[in-house]
Regions:
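RNA-interacting cores
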Residues: 1-249
Length: 249
C-alpha cells in the first residue's frame, strides 16, 4: 500500500517556515509507537518520507508511507481525527494546528499496472520540491547525477515491494546509458537539520529516455515510487521530495 497524508498547518505562536521540516520529523517519532520509532531510527531505508512546502498562502506538511506496517503505525496514527494539533518544544512550546487533512491511498499493484499500461514517455519532467542531495564515496553530491538518482529509486522500490527484480546492475546500466538530462532549472538551497545546514538542490530536470518501451515505463515507475519515498538522503526528514510534472510522448 502506498499512502499520502497532506496536512495543512497554521500557528498563532510563530511564523512557519520550511526550516522546521526536520523538527516535524520529531513530531512523527513522538506520535507513533516507541518500539516502532526505534526500529525506524536504525533503518537504512525508511518506509516513509516527509516534506513541508508552501502552496500559495498555505503550508502543506506531507507524510507518505509504503507498506502495510508503515500504513498501520504511521499513516493511521497521523490521519486519525484525534491528531489535530501538536506542540513544538524547540519553538518555546508553540502550538501548531492542523486545519485540514487530505488522504490518498493506492495499492502497489495498481500503481505498477497503471504506469506500465501508459503509453511510453520519451521525456520525463521531474520537479525536486524540497532540497535533494546524495551521498557517494563519503561525500555529498548536490547535482542530479542520473546514476545516483536511478540507483536509490531502484533500491527504494525494491524495499517497498520486497521484489528483488527492481534492482540489478544490468538494468541500472541500461537506464543510465539510455537517459540524459536535456534541460534543467536548478538552484542550490540550504536544508536545516539540528543546528546545521545541508546543501541540496531544488528545481526541475527533463530527462530524455531512449530505448524500448519497457525501459521508458520502468523509469517512470521508479519516479512514481519516488513521489512517495523521495530521493537521495534524509527523505524521512523532509529532503528529496519529488513529483512528475509532465511527460512528453
Amino acid at each position: 500500500m502506498l499512502t499520502k497524508l497532506r496536512m495543512y498547518i497554521t500557528s498563532d505562536d510563530f511564523e512557519i517556515t520550511r526550516h522546521i521540516s526536520s523538527v516535524l520529523h520529531g513530531v512523527i517519532m513522538s506520535a507513533i509507537d516507541t518500539d516502532y520509532a526505534s526500529i525506524l531510527h536504525n533503518s537504512n531505508l525508511n518506509p516513509f518520507s516527509t516534506s513541508l512546502v508552501k502552496n500559495g498562502d498555505e503550508w502543506c506538511w506531507t507524510v507518505a508511507t509504503v507498506g502495510q506496517e508503515a500504513y498501520d503505525k504511521i499513516f493511521k496514527v497521523l490521519a486519525d481525527k484525534s491528531f489535530s494539533s501538536f506542540v513544538l518544544t524547540s519553538k518555546e512550546n508553540a502550538v501548531v494546528n492542523i486545519v485540514k487533512k487530505e488522504t490518498f491511498e493506492i495499492p502497489v499493484e495498481n500503481l505498477l499496472k497503471a504506469t506500465f499500461n501508459d503509453e511510453p514517455s520519451s521525456v520525463l519532467k521531474i520537479s525536486f520540491d524540497t532540497p535533494a542531495a546524495f551521498k557517494s564515496r563519503n561525500d555529498y553530491v548536490i547535482v542530479p547525477d542520473l546514476h545516483l538518482v536511478f540507483q536509490i529509486l531502484m533500491k527504494k522500490a525494491t524495499a517497498a515491494t520486497s521484489d528483488d527484480s527492481f534492482f540489478d546492475e544490468e538494468t541500472l546500466d541500461a537506464l543510465v546509458q539510455n537517459s540524459k538530462i536535456i534541460s534543467y532549472n536548478l538552484r542550490t538551497v540550504k536544508f536545516s537539520l539540528e543546528g546545521r545546514r545541508i546543501t541540496g538542490f531544488t528545481g526541475y530536470i527533463s530527462i530524455y529516455i531512449k530505448g524500448p518501451s519497457l525501459l521508458k515505463n520502468f523509469a517512470k515507475t521508479l519516479f512514481r515510487f519516488g513521489e512517495y519515498l523521495g530521493v537521495g538522503i534524509k527523505a524521512s526528514i523532509g529532503m528529496g521530495a519529488l513529483s512528475i510534472k509532465e511527460d512528453e510522448k
